[in-house]
Amino acid sequence: ECSVFLAKEGRGGAQQGLEIWDDYIFSCEDGGHVNIYDFKSADPKPVAGFELASSHPDNHVNNVCFGVETKRGASFPLLYITNGKVGSELEWLCFVESITRRGKRFSSEIAQTIELDGSKWVEKGYVPIFGAPSWLVDRERGFIWIFSARKRTVAKVTKHAWENQYVATKFRIPSLSEGAKVRLDENDILDQVVFPYEVWFTQAGCMHDGKIYFCFGVGKQDDNRPSCIRVYDTDRRTITARYNVQEQVIY
């Protein structure tokens, strides 16, 4: 069952990645602004806001996930920022930000930048991805997974489902002690799971204890790309749940 929990009032920017920690909802906009809402009261108006340190016209902030490590002096665990903009110089980067709260004021700094290098995956026997990696932190197990596909998931590139596959690739979560810049390549891959392609247009997702919960579609803009959720089990290596939320998406 799906129902509206909070009808947020934002600044008018395109809503993108969202995360929750304790009583705070961190709702990100394209470009890097973050609106913060009170989870307990579900007040539609933000209680605070700030700019990500990685704010940039090309930073789509497509997905955000809190990690397992907290930088000294910070108020929240590290936040992993997925760019998600195809063709951008930022496309293969994950900005790891540390957020500090002082009263009603929030601020953020880049604690680490992770670059994904997929240039030699095929040489090592792994399935390649087209780009736009979505960085998903599995806090329960302490790993980070990259979710993407062989080809772009828009209809003009993938015309038929059989042409494509979704790909989930497992890595360690780099610690801050590894430095300000870290590169993950084919030698860092711990596991890879390939899932059937049956829904178009990736949005964002999250992980919990080995399962990927991912959203797809564009709502009522296009009936051929309906809003839906899939649950991918990386242990069983299969899709374990399918949800259609087209009726609940008002746009």
Question: Where do the PLM segments sit?
Answer:
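Blade-loop segments of beta-propeller domains
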Residues: 42-85
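Beta-propeller blade signature
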Residues: 89-104, 157-177, 225-237
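Structural signature of eukaryotic scaffold interfaces centered on beta-propeller domains
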Residues: 10-21, 60-77, 125-145, 150-151, ...
